[in-house]
């Protein structure tokens, strides 16, 4: 979809060779732009920019110059402000059935960010691998942190993701304030065992869910970050990336009345693995 680069469906085969759509979303374009969806907006499947996650106070300073950004969550800037890249119409080119190229030019000052930013995002599918490549250039110093926001439910007949197992290949995560603003301190999961996913854990064990950024150093090449699986149907999603962090959000605040096939999506209906 060239609206927000939305990933509407991802079909994979389960252990019985049945095709399963493993991401949350809607059946029609109209549902993605409906006002009631935007009121409690979970960013289903969308490209996020200019800056994924939160910026404290909606202000950034670059070269001693302060830029005031669009503030859209408790006085902070979430996912680049409103409207972000998730609500923009992208130019789309489809060379073949396995590749899609999206391009968007964000003008200088859009949502308060400095510089004209040219962004190209490439989607490709090959040998059961779905690949996302981000490219961006700007005519002046700026901040950019692009990400994707699909919510996975590997067994859509389940009302929630409690029976999914998650493994994360790191022992570190970012400390945050009560408003989920990073403090700049990297903590070890040894200090808070509820955050330790070095071994696969059922998500049902996370009583209050997760909305946290796990850190992976500064990789030069894509490295293994996460594995999400459902034991009953044999589907596993493996995440590799050269990003330094992976935001894990268990969808605590999802409340959508009319998802795919008219299904109600409530809290913990899907898990977002944002890279």
Set out the residue ranges of the language-model regions.
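An exposed, glycine/acidic-rich loop-and-rim segment of catalytic or binding clefts
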Residues: 1-275
């Amino acid at each position: 979809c060239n609206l927000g680069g939305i990933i509407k469906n991802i079909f994979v085969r389960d252990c019985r060779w049945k095709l399963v759509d493993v991401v949350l979303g809607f059946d029609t374009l109209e549902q993605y732009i409906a006002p009631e969806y935007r009121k409690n907006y979970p960013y289903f499947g969308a490209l996020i920019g200019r800056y994924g996650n939160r910026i404290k106070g909606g202000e950034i300073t670059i070269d001693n110059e302060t830029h005031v950004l669009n503030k859209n969550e408790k006085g902070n800037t979430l996912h680049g402000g409103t409207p972000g890249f998730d609500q923009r119409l992208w130019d789309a080119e489809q060379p073949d059935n396995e590749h899609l190229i999206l391009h968007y030019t964000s003008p200088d000052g859009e949502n308060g960010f400095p510089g004209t930013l040219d962004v190209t995002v490439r989607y490709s599918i090959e040998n059961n691998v779905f690949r996302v490549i981000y490219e961006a250039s700007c005519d002046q110093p700026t901040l950019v942190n692009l990400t994707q926001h699909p919510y996975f439910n590997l067994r859509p007949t389940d009302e929630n993701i409690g029976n999914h197992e998650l493994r994360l290949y790191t022992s570190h995560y970012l400390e945050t304030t009560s408003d989920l603003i990073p403090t700049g301190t990297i903590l070890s999961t040894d200090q808070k065992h509820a955050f330790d996913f070095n071994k696969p854990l059922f998500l049902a064990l996370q009583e209050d869910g997760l909305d946290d950024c796990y850190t992976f150093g500064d990789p030069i090449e894509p490295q293994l970050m996460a594995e999400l699986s459902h034991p009953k149907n044999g589907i596993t999603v493996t995440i590799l990336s050269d990003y330094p962090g992976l935001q894990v959000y268990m969808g605590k605040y999802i409340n959508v009345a009319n998802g795919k096939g008219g299904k109600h999506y409530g809290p913990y209906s899907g898990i977002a693995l944002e890279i």
